[in-house]
Curated annotation (Swiss-Prot):
An annotated Gene Ontology molecular function: DNA binding
Record keywords: Acetylation, Cell membrane, Coiled coil, DNA-binding, Membrane, Phosphoprotein, Transmembrane, Transmembrane helix
Bias type Basic and acidic residues, positions: 147-184
Membrane topology (Extracellular): 1-66
Protein name: Coiled-coil domain-containing protein 25
Subunit structure and binding partners: Interacts (via cytoplasmic region) with ILK.
Transmembrane segments: 67-83
Role, per record: Transmembrane receptor that senses neutrophil extracellular traps (NETs) and triggers the ILK-PARVB pathway to enhance cell motility. NETs are mainly composed of DNA fibers and are released by neutrophils to bind pathogens during inflammation. Formation of NETs is also associated with cancer metastasis, NET-DNA acting as a chemotactic factor to attract cancer cells. Specifically binds NETs on its extracellular region, in particular the 8-OHdG-enriched DNA present in NETs, and recruits ILK, initiating the ILK-PARVB cascade to induce cytoskeleton rearrangement and directional migration of cells.
Predominant subcellular localization, coarse grouping: membrane
Modified residues (Phosphoserine): 204
Species the sequence originates in: Pongo abelii (Sumatran orangutan)
Coiled-coil intervals, chain numbering: 117-187
Pfam families reported for this sequence: NFACT-R_1
Compartments in which it is found: Cell membrane; Endomembrane system
Protein backbone atom coordinates (compact mmCIF):
# COMPACT_ATOMS: atom_id res chain seq x y z
CA UNK A 1 0.00 0.00 0.00
CA UNK A 2 1.23 3.45 -0.89
CA UNK A 3 -0.19 6.67 0.54
CA UNK A 4 -0.51 9.62 -1.84
CA UNK A 5 -0.93 13.27 -0.89
CA UNK A 6 -1.37 16.45 -2.89
CA UNK A 7 0.57 19.63 -2.18
CA UNK A 8 0.45 22.95 -3.95
CA UNK A 9 1.83 26.46 -3.67
CA UNK A 10 0.47 29.81 -4.74
CA UNK A 11 2.72 30.05 -7.79
CA UNK A 12 2.71 26.47 -9.05
CA UNK A 13 0.48 23.57 -10.01
CA UNK A 14 -0.12 20.66 -7.65
CA UNK A 15 2.60 18.20 -6.65
CA UNK A 16 2.25 14.55 -5.67
CA UNK A 17 3.80 13.36 -2.41
CA UNK A 18 3.86 9.67 -1.57
CA UNK A 19 5.18 7.26 1.05
CA UNK A 20 5.13 3.55 1.77
CA UNK A 21 3.25 1.82 4.57
CA UNK A 22 6.33 0.18 6.10
CA UNK A 23 10.03 -0.49 5.58
CA UNK A 24 9.34 -3.44 3.29
CA UNK A 25 7.31 -1.26 0.98
CA UNK A 26 10.09 1.30 1.12
CA UNK A 27 12.28 -1.23 -0.67
CA UNK A 28 9.97 -1.16 -3.69
CA UNK A 29 9.84 2.63 -3.62
CA UNK A 30 13.64 2.79 -3.61
CA UNK A 31 13.85 0.29 -6.46
CA UNK A 32 11.20 1.83 -8.69
CA UNK A 33 11.68 5.55 -8.04
CA UNK A 34 11.58 8.08 -10.87
CA UNK A 35 14.29 10.57 -11.87
CA UNK A 36 11.78 13.30 -10.97
CA UNK A 37 11.50 12.05 -7.36
CA UNK A 38 13.00 13.75 -4.31
CA UNK A 39 13.47 11.57 -1.21
CA UNK A 40 12.86 12.88 2.34
CA UNK A 41 13.79 11.37 5.72
CA UNK A 42 14.28 12.61 9.28
CA UNK A 43 18.00 13.05 9.87
CA UNK A 44 19.58 10.47 12.22
CA UNK A 45 16.16 9.12 13.33
CA UNK A 46 13.79 6.45 12.11
CA UNK A 47 10.99 7.80 9.93
CA UNK A 48 8.88 7.14 6.89
CA UNK A 49 10.46 7.49 3.45
CA UNK A 50 8.58 10.32 1.78
CA UNK A 51 8.92 11.16 -1.91
CA UNK A 52 8.04 14.32 -3.80
CA UNK A 53 7.48 13.94 -7.53
CA UNK A 54 8.68 17.03 -9.36
CA UNK A 55 7.25 18.24 -12.62
CA UNK A 56 9.27 17.39 -15.71
CA UNK A 57 12.13 19.79 -16.25
CA UNK A 58 12.36 20.78 -12.58
CA UNK A 59 15.16 20.01 -10.16
CA UNK A 60 15.62 20.08 -6.40
CA UNK A 61 16.28 23.83 -6.45
CA UNK A 62 12.85 24.46 -7.97
CA UNK A 63 10.81 23.06 -5.06
CA UNK A 64 8.42 25.77 -3.80
CA UNK A 65 8.97 26.59 -0.13
CA UNK A 66 5.40 25.63 0.81
CA UNK A 67 5.74 22.24 -0.86
CA UNK A 68 9.14 21.66 0.76
CA UNK A 69 7.67 22.32 4.20
CA UNK A 70 4.71 20.03 3.47
CA UNK A 71 7.12 17.18 2.78
CA UNK A 72 9.24 17.96 5.84
CA UNK A 73 6.22 18.10 8.16
CA UNK A 74 4.88 14.84 6.76
CA UNK A 75 8.21 13.10 7.40
CA UNK A 76 8.43 14.50 10.93
CA UNK A 77 4.86 13.42 11.72
CA UNK A 78 5.71 9.88 10.60
CA UNK A 79 8.74 9.51 12.83
CA UNK A 80 8.12 7.84 16.21
CA UNK A 81 10.78 9.99 17.88
CA UNK A 82 10.76 12.99 15.59
CA UNK A 83 7.03 13.67 15.96
CA UNK A 84 7.59 14.47 19.65
CA UNK A 85 10.51 16.83 19.11
CA UNK A 86 11.05 20.42 18.01
CA UNK A 87 13.75 21.66 15.63
CA UNK A 88 13.92 18.40 13.71
CA UNK A 89 16.27 18.23 10.74
CA UNK A 90 14.96 16.57 7.60
CA UNK A 91 17.34 15.49 4.85
CA UNK A 92 16.30 15.39 1.21
CA UNK A 93 18.02 14.43 -2.01
CA UNK A 94 17.19 13.29 -5.56
CA UNK A 95 16.13 9.66 -5.86
CA UNK A 96 19.10 9.08 -8.20
CA UNK A 97 21.43 9.85 -5.28
CA UNK A 98 20.11 6.97 -3.16
CA UNK A 99 22.52 4.06 -2.80
CA UNK A 100 21.35 0.57 -1.92
CA UNK A 101 23.82 -2.29 -1.44
CA UNK A 102 23.25 -5.98 -0.72
CA UNK A 103 24.62 -5.74 2.83
CA UNK A 104 22.10 -3.07 3.91
CA UNK A 105 19.08 -3.86 6.07
CA UNK A 106 15.53 -3.63 4.74
CA UNK A 107 14.62 0.02 4.21
CA UNK A 108 18.19 1.20 4.78
CA UNK A 109 19.90 3.40 2.20
CA UNK A 110 23.04 5.45 1.72
CA UNK A 111 24.05 8.22 -0.68
CA UNK A 112 26.28 8.27 -3.73
CA UNK A 113 27.21 11.93 -3.17
CA UNK A 114 26.87 13.51 0.25
CA UNK A 115 27.17 16.99 -1.30
CA UNK A 116 23.81 16.45 -3.02
CA UNK A 117 22.00 15.97 0.30
CA UNK A 118 20.16 19.02 1.62
CA UNK A 119 18.68 19.76 5.04
CA UNK A 120 15.56 21.62 6.09
CA UNK A 121 14.56 22.19 9.72
CA UNK A 122 11.04 21.80 11.08
CA UNK A 123 10.84 23.99 14.17
CA UNK A 124 7.60 22.57 15.50
CA UNK A 125 4.50 20.66 14.48
CA UNK A 126 1.98 22.67 12.48
CA UNK A 127 -1.42 20.99 12.61
CA UNK A 128 -2.83 23.13 9.79
CA UNK A 129 -0.29 21.65 7.36
CA UNK A 130 -0.87 18.06 8.45
CA UNK A 131 -4.67 18.43 8.44
CA UNK A 132 -4.59 19.90 4.94
CA UNK A 133 -2.43 17.05 3.65
CA UNK A 134 -4.57 14.45 5.39
CA UNK A 135 -7.63 15.66 3.48
CA UNK A 136 -5.86 14.83 0.21
CA UNK A 137 -4.67 11.37 1.33
CA UNK A 138 -5.39 8.47 -1.01
CA UNK A 139 -4.45 4.81 -0.48
CA UNK A 140 -3.41 2.84 -3.57
CA UNK A 141 -1.90 -0.52 -4.42
CA UNK A 142 0.12 0.47 -7.49
CA UNK A 143 2.23 -1.74 -9.71
CA UNK A 144 5.34 0.37 -9.19
CA UNK A 145 7.42 -1.56 -11.71
CA UNK A 146 4.76 -1.19 -14.43
CA UNK A 147 4.34 2.54 -13.72
CA UNK A 148 8.12 3.05 -13.93
CA UNK A 149 8.29 1.13 -17.22
CA UNK A 150 5.41 3.20 -18.62
CA UNK A 151 7.19 6.40 -17.63
CA UNK A 152 10.48 5.22 -19.16
CA UNK A 153 8.72 4.14 -22.36
CA UNK A 154 7.12 7.56 -22.73
CA UNK A 155 10.52 9.19 -22.23
CA UNK A 156 12.09 6.94 -24.88
CA UNK A 157 9.29 7.77 -27.31
CA UNK A 158 9.71 11.49 -26.62
CA UNK A 159 13.45 11.30 -27.24
CA UNK A 160 12.84 9.29 -30.41
CA UNK A 161 10.36 11.91 -31.62
CA UNK A 162 12.84 14.69 -30.80
CA UNK A 163 15.59 12.94 -32.78
CA UNK A 164 13.25 12.45 -35.73
CA UNK A 165 12.23 16.10 -35.60
CA UNK A 166 15.88 17.17 -35.43
CA UNK A 167 16.70 15.02 -38.46
CA UNK A 168 13.71 16.44 -40.32
CA UNK A 169 14.87 19.99 -39.61
CA UNK A 170 18.43 19.17 -40.64
CA UNK A 171 17.14 17.67 -43.88
CA UNK A 172 15.01 20.75 -44.49
CA UNK A 173 17.97 23.05 -43.80
CA UNK A 174 20.15 21.06 -46.19
CA UNK A 175 17.45 21.29 -48.85
CA UNK A 176 17.17 25.07 -48.38
CA UNK A 177 20.95 25.44 -48.51
CA UNK A 178 21.12 23.38 -51.69
CA UNK A 179 18.37 25.47 -53.28
CA UNK A 180 20.15 28.69 -52.29
CA UNK A 181 23.44 27.38 -53.69
CA UNK A 182 21.69 26.47 -56.94
CA UNK A 183 20.03 29.88 -57.07
CA UNK A 184 23.35 31.67 -56.52
CA UNK A 185 24.98 29.50 -59.15
CA UNK A 186 22.18 30.25 -61.62
CA UNK A 187 22.33 33.99 -60.84
CA UNK A 188 26.09 33.98 -61.34
CA UNK A 189 25.70 32.16 -64.65
CA UNK A 190 23.07 34.63 -65.84
CA UNK A 191 25.33 37.53 -64.90
CA UNK A 192 28.19 36.09 -66.94
CA UNK A 193 25.90 35.51 -69.92
CA UNK A 194 24.61 39.08 -69.71
CA UNK A 195 28.14 40.43 -69.64
CA UNK A 196 29.01 38.36 -72.70
CA UNK A 197 25.93 39.62 -74.53
CA UNK A 198 26.80 43.23 -73.75
CA UNK A 199 30.37 42.77 -74.95
CA UNK A 200 29.16 41.22 -78.21
CA UNK A 201 26.81 44.14 -78.73
CA UNK A 202 29.57 46.70 -78.18
CA UNK A 203 31.88 45.02 -80.69
CA UNK A 204 29.14 45.08 -83.28
CA UNK A 205 28.54 48.82 -82.75
CA UNK A 206 32.22 49.62 -83.23
CA UNK A 207 32.33 47.91 -86.66
CA UNK A 208 29.27 49.74 -87.96
Amino acid sequence: MVFYFTSSSVNSSAYTIYMGKDKYENEDLIKHGWPEDIWFHVDKLSSAHVYLRLHKGENIEDIPKEVLMDCAHLVKANSIQGCKMNNVNVVYTPWSNLKKTADMDVGQIGFHRQKDVKIVTVEKKVNEILNRLEKTKVERFPDLAAEKECRDREERNEKKAQIQEMKRREKEEMKKKREMDELRSYSSLMKVENMSSNQDGNDSDEFM
